């Protein structure tokens, strides 16, 4: 036999007007904030990832592949010097 914890049931919560008043404002505003975060380019600045036009610059057009198993550190150093 289980006891009552005194909490409201899930069905009671999602059928209340208070729930929908709060969430009809917060869910769209979170969506809009996320869209603005990505569309303005702020996400690139915050996380430090290159923008789509910065992956391959004029002086670096090759794909950064490591091909050797034993000289991988030299290849990484050579690649990092091209920045």
Curated annotation (Swiss-Prot):
Cofactor comment text: With its partner (PsbF) binds heme. PSII binds additional chlorophylls, carotenoids and specific lipids.
Gene Ontology CC annotations of this record: chloroplast thylakoid membrane; photosystem II reaction center
Membrane-topology annotation of the record: Single-pass membrane protein
InterPro entries registered for this protein in UniProt: PSII_cyt_b559_asu, PSII_cyt_b559_asu_sf, PSII_cyt_b559_CS, PSII_cyt_b559_N, PSII_cytb559_asu_lum
Chief localization: plastid
Subcellular localization: Plastid, Chloroplast thylakoid membrane
TM ranges: 21-35
Pfam families the record matches: Cytochrom_B559, Cytochrom_B559a
One GO BP: photosynthetic electron transport chain
Residues that coordinate or bind heme: 23
GO molecular function annotations of the record: electron transfer activity; heme binding; iron ion binding
N-terminal signal peptide: none
Function: This b-type cytochrome is tightly associated with the reaction center of photosystem II (PSII). PSII is a light-driven water:plastoquinone oxidoreductase that uses light energy to abstract electrons from H(2)O, generating O(2) and a proton gradient subsequently used for ATP formation. It consists of a core antenna complex that captures photons, and an electron transfer chain that converts photonic excitation into a charge separation.
Family: Belongs to the PsbE/PsbF family.
Name of the protein this chain belongs to: Cytochrome b559 subunit alpha
Species the sequence originates in: Helianthus annuus
Taxonomic placement: Eukaryota, Viridiplantae, Streptophyta, Embryophyta, Tracheophyta
């Amino acid at each position: 036999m289980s006891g009552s914890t005194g909490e409201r049931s899930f069905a009671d919560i999602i059928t209340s007007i208070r729930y929908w008043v709060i969430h009809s404002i917060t869910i769209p505003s979170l969506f809009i904030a996320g869209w603005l975060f990505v569309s303005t380019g702020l996400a690139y600045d915050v996380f430090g990832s290159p923008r789509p036009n910065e992956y391959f610059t004029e002086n670096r057009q090759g794909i950064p592949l490591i091909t050797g198993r034993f000289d991988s550190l030299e290849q990484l150093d050579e690649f990092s010097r091209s920045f």
